């Protein structure tokens, strides 16, 4: 199955179990890691992309990502610094991936926050905020994940 729109994307996310949704969401957020230089976010996503991550490891990663999210929010300031805003959205997306259970809403929120991060970066670079390219990249990423995992 090749995913080509949000309806198919949502259906594919919904069909996965919690572990599969966590791994898929982590991959989607990893696509926007170039927008964040926070090692806590990167480390947490690397952890939860693995099927064998323990609950204790995920709990530690969740605490680290929460701190990163709070710190990134305070860096956004009032001047609409789009690059800082992008990094904040990456942290918010990562936080969805380190919840104790990643249900459909969490995975979908992670995807949406990743799209928002890319929109912010696009605004910072050229004044054009579009999430279409990121959505299309997510379709490709989720399709590849489903093929690799046999889902």
Regions found by a protein language model. Give the residues of each.
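Structured binding/interaction patches within domain cores
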Residues: 1-151
């Amino acid at each position: 199955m090749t995913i080509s729109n949000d309806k198919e994307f949502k259906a594919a996310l919904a069909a996965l179990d919690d572990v599969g949704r966590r791994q898929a969401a982590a991959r989607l957020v990893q696509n926007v890691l170039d927008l964040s230089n926070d090692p806590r976010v990167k480390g947490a996503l690397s952890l939860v992309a693995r099927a064998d991550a323990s609950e204790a490891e995920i709990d530690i990663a969740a605490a680290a990502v929460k701190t990163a999210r709070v710190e990134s929010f305070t860096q956004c300031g009032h001047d609409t610094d789009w690059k800082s805003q992008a990094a904040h959205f990456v942290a918010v997306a990562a936080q969805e991936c380190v919840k104790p259970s990643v249900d459909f809403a969490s995975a979908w929120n992670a995807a949406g926050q990743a799209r928002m991060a890319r929109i912010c970066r696009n605004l910072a670079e050229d004044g054009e905020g579009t999430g279409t390219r990121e959505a299309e990249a997510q379709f490709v990423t989720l399709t590849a994940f489903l093929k690799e995992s046999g889902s």
